Amino acid sequence: MAKKVTAVIKLALPAGKATPAPPVGPALGAHGVNIMAFCKEYNERTKDQVGLVIPVEITVYEDRSFTFILKTPPTAVLIKKALGIETASGVPNKQKVGKLTDAQVEEIAKIKMPDLNANDLEAAKRMVRGTARSMGVDVE
């Protein structure tokens, strides 16, 4: 028989740097999850992606055990990494912060494909271009 799910918690944590401090501790502690076990496992599974923010969906069961699914990093984080910038534009229509090539857009779209509700790569590329434009990034 399947275990009964008591909660689904969504967090966005820096890869390889999860600690029991907020936001992890309070979110998991409220459901009686072993916080250190989660932190160790999360850090182990994300150690090759250090520097990125990785969203995670934690499913907590009735017996206080848990499983978690790692998602792909947010599109904005991947765009900032590709351009080597810290922050996006505060006024995206007037102030541009960089240019993204079509090859970079395609690479980001391929990374994001499992989490997007796009049917093909072209649709995924359009989503990435839209995110880039809203960040003040020109797309060539």
Curated annotation (Swiss-Prot):
NCBIfam families with a match to the protein in the record: L11_bact
GO molecular function, one term: structural constituent of ribosome
Organism expressing this protein natively: Symbiobacterium thermophilum (strain DSM 24528 / JCM 14929 / IAM 14863 / T)
GO BP terms: translation
Gene name of the encoded protein: rplK
Function as written in the Swiss-Prot or TrEMBL entry: Forms part of the ribosomal stalk which helps the ribosome interact with GTP-bound translation factors.
UniProt subunit comment: Part of the ribosomal stalk of the 50S ribosomal subunit. Interacts with L10 and the large rRNA to form the base of the stalk. L10 forms an elongated spine to which L12 dimers bind in a sequential fashion forming a multimeric L10(L12)X complex.
Name of this chain's protein: Large ribosomal subunit protein uL11
Organism superkingdom: Bacteria
Family according to the record: Belongs to the universal ribosomal protein uL11 family.
